[in-house]
Every structure is written in C-alpha cells, then in structure tokens.
Swiss-Prot record:
Protein name: ATP synthase subunit alpha
The protein's assembly and partners: F-type ATPases have 2 components, CF(1) - the catalytic core - and CF(0) - the membrane proton channel. CF(1) has five subunits: alpha(3), beta(3), gamma(1), delta(1), epsilon(1). CF(0) has three main subunits: a(1), b(2) and c(9-12). The alpha and beta chains form an alternating ring which encloses part of the gamma chain. CF(1) is attached to CF(0) by a central stalk formed by the gamma and epsilon chains, while a peripheral stalk is formed by the delta and b chains.
Membrane topology note: Peripheral membrane protein
The encoding gene: atpA
GO cellular component, one term: proton-transporting ATP synthase complex
C-alpha cells in the first residue's frame, strides 16, 4: 500500500511552529561614522537621535549628540577619538548622560563621567541622576537666610555668602582665587563636626582644564586638613578632551543636587568657568556653528546660566536643602568687561573681585572692596556679625581713598590723619594667611575691638598687630572660652563689658605694662 502525504497535517504543524515562534523584532537607531576630526564625529543616519542623547561607538567609546542636521548628526567623542574610525557603527542609547550620586562619592576623586580616578576602587553607588536637569522653579525656592561661613574675615564680614547663593570669585591668575575656595571648603570641617547631619555642608570641587599637578596639590591639601571626607573632587584636567572639560561642571552640579534635593546642604566650586567657556568654544567651532563675540558661540550665556541657576535654597515643602555655587573666572590684566566675565557677573548674586595690585602690596586675600558685592548674603549674616561689620566697609573704603589722596600732599588735618591711622590698623586686622580659616566668633572679637576699642588697639605698634591678633585669640581660647561661645550667635551688653575688660588686661600684658 502506497503511503499518502497528508498535506493538511503538515500545514497545521507548520502553522503551530510559526505561531509558537517568539523572537520579537528589535529595532535599533544606528548610524555610520563619516569622518572624525579633533574629537567631533560626523555620523550619517541616527534619524531618531535626540539632542544631548548618549551614543555608543563600535569600540565602546561614548559620545553625546550636540548637533542635528537633515541626514547627519555631530557627536562629541567622550574619550580618545583615535578609537573611532570612519565606517564605525554608532548606536543610540535612548538616554541622556547620567552620573552616580550619593554619600559613596564623598572622599573620592572622579572624572566628568563619575568614574573613579583615585585608585580606590569602583564607585559603588546605586543612585544615578541626569547630568542635565531643570533648575528649581520660583515656588520651590526660598530666599537665602542661612550663612555659609568661609572662615575668611574680609568675606564673612563685608561680602557675606548665604546658603543657596551664587557668588563669583574673579581676578587675574595666581592671586588667590583657588585659595579662597579651598579655605571655604576647609572651614566647613569645624562646623560639620559640631552640627547635626542635616546641617552639615558637603562640598564638591570641580577642576576644569587645570594641570594634573595642581589638582594633586588641591587633593593633598584637602586630605591634610581632613576636608576630603566630606568632599568630592571632579577632575577634567588640561590633558582631557574638550567635551570632558565641558561636562565636568554639570557632573559636579548633579552630585551636589543629590544633597540639595534630600534636605542637606552642599557647596560646589567651579574652578574655573573661563576654561569651561574655551572648551565649549572649541567644540562649537569644530561643529561649524557661527562664531560671535570673541569667537564664542551665541549660546555661551545659556551654557553658564543653566548651570548656575541650579544653585538654590529650597522651600520647606522641598526639604529645606541648599546648593551654593562658587564659580571662578580668570581675567586678563584685570579686565572684567570681557565677554565671559560680564556674562557670569550678570548671572550670579555678587562677586568677590581680587586685585593684583593689592596682592603684590601684601594685602592678602587681595579683595577689592569697592568692586566686590554680595547682593543677597547680608540677609544671612549672624546678629553678632551685623553689629560689628556695619562701619567696617565704610572705614576701609575711606582709607583706600585717603591713601591715594595722601600721596599728593603732606599737610593733613587731624581727622584725616586719624582715618589713615585707623585704616592701617584695619588692613592689618583683615590680613589672613592662606589655609588658616577663622571661626566667626574670633572675627567678631577682632572687629569689635577695632570699632569700639580703638584707643586700646592704638597702643599696639602697627608692626606688632599680626602677632597681637593671634595671641589675643589664643588668650580668649585658653582663659575665656565661654565668651567666644556666646559670640557665635549674638552680642549682649554683658558680653561687650567682658570683651572690654579682657582686651584691656591683655593689651597691658602685651605691652609689658
């Protein structure tokens, strides 16, 4: 008997196999590298790519889409562009750039992508946040009302900074801009040791376009002072590509936002945004965007404003956290009217202007009081500081004016001579060595003596003032620590009497009377 083929059975078997087959079609948005030049890859395809989207090259190198044309995309390569070749495949990730955040990053040195570069192992953080995020709205914010103590007398007294403020540090190279930022970070050590967890100030130091040797010195200084334990250092050195230098401040800001959004306080230092602007200019010119003033692209203002607007003091409903920004700008020959300096001055809530002439005269920190201002920080000053700081700025400004006037003639009346003499004492009191931040109560003592006990102060030789102020503070700590403790908040009449008696006795001892 001949075997007959049952076609219906075969059809049913094939149908069952087809219906049971489960291999979903996977669509990927891919493109092909046309050319690579100086860290910029021109890619054909990527029809559905989004601006700012993260992409992967065949070699595993990451990139960011920063330019979109009809059929091509301009991608900045985050790494060595030698690993990217013409004809390589590029895949879209569907995500924007993210960095790890959290307490796990404290005490660590990372690059602009959040990868560890301190040979201390991987960053084991489960939390990640988008590098680019929207700044808090008006309703989510609260006015600045809590002080951020820098430990630098001339700043805490005359140009106070509040938590949530953006205060620019501007000046020529090598006159102490980074020192001010570092001393502010170091000064938080004593404060953090005495307060609750939610009142501590965590710090992020972002080094942009600096020499690796310079960054190593900064990290060592933070280690020596014990400040690295509450600080994260984000590094995009001069040897890193322009895209990494461009991303570094946004990565540092995101790390700080974690603390802000969780009801804590954070200080972010951007050192410096001049080099950040240069890196962005380089990228924009390579992407063939039209240049504007000083060859910067038209959106350079937005690049900095969207970064600095993320610094804020949050409302009670949003956890009361804060993110304070200390951007640094380097000027050329003191020219604050250049494009990038004027941009950042208009974005921030004030500026601390450092002057080369004052620095070379030996007045350090070399802060020019006439050009420096804090627009919102005075609301955050402690009561005791407000009481003694009121007349200090005027006295210093008058002294600077009279100092120039006195050069033209020797015949000065008694009142002018008194103002000049008082100014000399004030300048000596305000001088401060680097990396020696001074607690607010010690600052109050010295300024109270100048404002109210000048007769006592004038008995000291001007050349001995530096020794006198440090010896006096040590005398307070060893003999009257309770008076200093009370001064950290307010100043009553009883405390004023105590200070008068203590200073009178000490001046007599100091002069050997």
């Amino acid at each position: 008997m001949k075997n007959s083929i049952n076609t219906s059975e075969i059809v049913n078997i094939i149908r069952e196999k087809v219906e049971a087959f489960d291999n979903p079609i996977k669509k990927e948005n891919i493109g092909e590298v046309i050319s690579v030049t100086d860290g910029i890859a021109l890619v054909y395809g990527l029809e559905k790519a989004k601006f700012g989207e993260k992409v992967f090259f065949t070699s595993g190198v990451e990139g960011i889409v920063l330019d979109l044309d009809h059929d091509t995309a301009g991608i900045v390569v985050l790494g060595n562009d030698r690993d990217v070749k013409e004809g390589d495949t590029v895949k879209c990730s569907g995500d924007v750039m993210q960095v790890p955040v959290g307490h796990e990053l404290l005490g660590r040195v990372v690059n602009a992508l959040g990868h560890s570069i301190d040979n201390s192992g991987e960053i084991r953080s489960k939390n990640r946040m988008d590098m680019e995020s929207k700044a808090p709205g008006i309703i989510d914010r609260k006015s600045v009302h809590e002080p951020l103590q820098t430990g630098i007398k001339i700043i805490d007294l005359l140009i106070p900074i509040g938590r949530g403020q953006r205060e620019l540090v501007i000046g020529d190279r090598q006159i102490g801009k980074t020192t001010i930022a570092l001393d502010t970070i170091v000064n938080q050590k004593k404060i953090n040791d005495e307060v609750d967890e939610n009142q501590k100030v965590y710090c992020v130091y972002v080094a942009i376009g600096q020499k690796i040797s310079t960054v190593a010195k900064v990290v060592n200084k933070l280690k020596e002072s014990g400040a690295l334990e509450y600080t994260t250092v984000v590094v995009a050195s001069a040897s890193d590509c322009a895209p990494m230098q461009f991303l570094a401040p946004y990565a540092g800001c995101t790390i700080g936002e974690f603390f802000r959004d969780n009801g804590m306080h954070c200080l972010v230092v951007y050192d410096d945004l001049s080099k950040h602007a240069v890196a962005y200019r380089q990228m924009s010119l390579l992407l063939r965007r039209p240049p504007g003033r000083e060859a910067y692209p038209g959106d350079i203002f937005y690049v900095h404003s969207r970064l600095l607007e993320r610094a804020a003091k949050m409302s009670d409903e949003k956890g009361r956290g804060s993110l304070t920004a200390l951007p640094i700008i380097e000027t050329q020959a003191g020219d604050v009217s250049a494009y990038v300096p004027t941009n950042v001055i208009s974005i921030t809530d004030g500026q601390i202007f450092l002057e080369s002439e004052l620095f070379h005269k030996g007045f350090r920190p070399a802060v020019n009081i006439g050009l420096s201002v804090s627009r919102v920080g005075s609301a955050a000053q402690l009561k005791s500081v407000k009481k003694v700081a009121g007349s200090i700025k005027l006295s210093l400004a008058q002294y600077r004016e009279l100092e120039d006037f006195a050069k033209f003639g020797s015949d000065l009346d008694a009142s002018v001579q008194l103002s000049l003499n008082k100014g000399k004492y004030l300048v000596e009191l305000l001088k401060q060595k680097q990396h020696l931040p001074m607690p607010v109560e010690e600052q109050v003592v010295l300024m109270y003596i100048f404002s109210n006990l000048y007769d006592q102060l004038s008995r000291i030789q001007i050349s001995d003032i530096n020794k006198f102020k440090y010896d006096l503070i040590n005398y307070f700590h060893t003999t009257y620590p309770e008076v200093l403790k009370k001064l950290s908040d307010s100043m009553s009449d009883d405390i004023k009497d105590d200070i008068f008696n203590i200073v009178s006795n000490f001046v007599a001892q100091f002069n050997g009377v």
